[in-house]
């Protein structure tokens, strides 16, 4: 099976790549850093929407699956980065990748404990999503 995998250069993503390769799957890794394994690699910076779009354009062929494993942990000073990487860019990449998936394909999205604290970010979400009008129409 041909599987696209984000976050495959380190951590859980790298371990997943190794296991899938041992089982004989073809893996295409999307990551900011070049992985240490011999697999096709597409640069992907989830902080940059242009990079997300470029990575989607570079994904050749059709895929049997997508494993979205990339993410960053929350810290006191990176709420906006967490929202961008772990939510907004995740959705952008997955939605953009759907046309490249075969009808029988599976999508797996891995989240960490970072997904548990999303409620703490609702003030930032409100600000970034501009839920209040900037001006009134009359």
Q: Positions of the model-derived regions?
A:
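Rossmann-fold cofactor-recognition segment
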Residues: 36-50
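Hydrophobic positions on the long internal alpha-helix
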Residues: 93-101
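Conserved small/polar residues in nucleotide/adenosyl-binding loops
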Residues: 137-138
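Conserved glycine-rich Rossmann-like NAD(P)H-binding loop of the short-chain dehydrogenase/reductase
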Residues: 23-36
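N-terminal Rossmann NAD(P)H-binding glycine-rich loop of SDR-like oxidoreductase domains
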Residues: 6-18
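Conserved NAD(P)H cofactor-binding loop of Rossmann-fold oxidoreductase domains
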Residues: 67-74
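A hydrophobic alpha-helix adjacent to the NAD(P)-binding/active-site core of NAD(P)-dependent oxidoreductases
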Residues: 41, 82-83
